[in-house]
């Protein structure tokens, strides 16, 4: 058993810094590279791509990342764990295998492919069997929107990743695993933590929670003393140095920008935390109220004292469904009286839509630069140098939303003076993909692990 296992984060979302994975494997010693690509809306995007082309449906940025880190995997034994499989883990694995062969590393990768989280093809069967997949916020059954569902994926835990590592995989590709499982799984594998080692498992979850968003815990998007954080253009992504007892240090590679401090780690700890006594995952429930966070040197933070308890018998399910259409148009009004001009344009546009008989589920106006973020707390903004009118509509009928998009440009000549920001053309109509969170019994979600070479 290793005394210390180093897990580095290389992606915090699909669209993150493309060069970060390479920097993490080249910047210093690590054992595992964790790449987190998936968010709730990402699954529906990937499902649409797969519908158009059955060979797609995964985070294609991962394939390029694998090409950049391939030497580290082959020569230094760094292992890769990523949820880049999206709704098509086998296709993702095939693409990675092809990259390895193209780069002269045929047979060097043992790719673990985790499937079973995708419930889209089983929805009708599950509903008929008494699993209503009720919305966690409203209590409504999924049957209300079943005909508009785009994707449905259960959040799976660390067990299938641990299984893949146990079968000798040096690259593990999952679909909708929890973000935290990508870090906890290698620790559980290396330290042989048992299924009821609640405190150690909870420590793995907290480690994963801290680094799952990439550089957000190493100086990026940090509110505390943000002006003094150095060299964010070369920000160092985080890594954890974990021990068998569950304690770990959060740090980053030397000669990189950003900062790892008690403040940066603490800000990330409370990100999407929910109940601090019960941070629920498929593997364990972690208690965040017992955590100790202490400085352990420059850019080093020691995390300890973590407690855990048994998980529930449910898994969370992320469902995405079609919910109509939207369009957003913008115009910029400048001083003097910028806000007053934008407000007049808003009234003109609303009256114009009413006269045309256009009806929408919602019309939303924001005055960016005046009160879009702080609302009535913004204070007197009558002397703002410029204000952007941001006018959006949503509704079930695409044609009605499309008609709205033709009403923004006429305001340039027919509305208040001192207007700019209209050179981008008419607003685009976009389909709305809504989120439906639900729970399902763990017993009905069966994961499968295949290892290909």
PLM segments and residue spans:
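N-terminal amphipathic/basic leader segments beginning at the initiator methionine
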Residues: 1-25
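Gly/Ser/Thr-rich loops at beta-strand to alpha-helix junctions
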Residues: 13-14, 39-41, 84-93, 176-182, ...
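A conserved active-site cap/scaffold subdomain adjacent to cofactor or substrate pockets
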Residues: 201-307
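Catalytic or ion-translocation cores adjacent to nucleophile or general acid/base/metal-coordination motifs
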Residues: 102-119, 184-225
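C-terminal non-catalytic interaction/assembly regions of soluble proteins
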Residues: 304-453
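Flexible, glycine/charged-enriched surface loops at secondary-structure junctions
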Residues: 106-110, 217-232, 276-295, 352-368, ...
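N-terminal glycine-rich anion-binding loops that anchor highly charged ligand groups
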Residues: 28-46
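Gly-rich Lys/Arg/Thr-decorated short loops/hinges at beta-loop-alpha junctions or inter-strand turns
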Residues: 1-3, 40-55, 74, 119-147
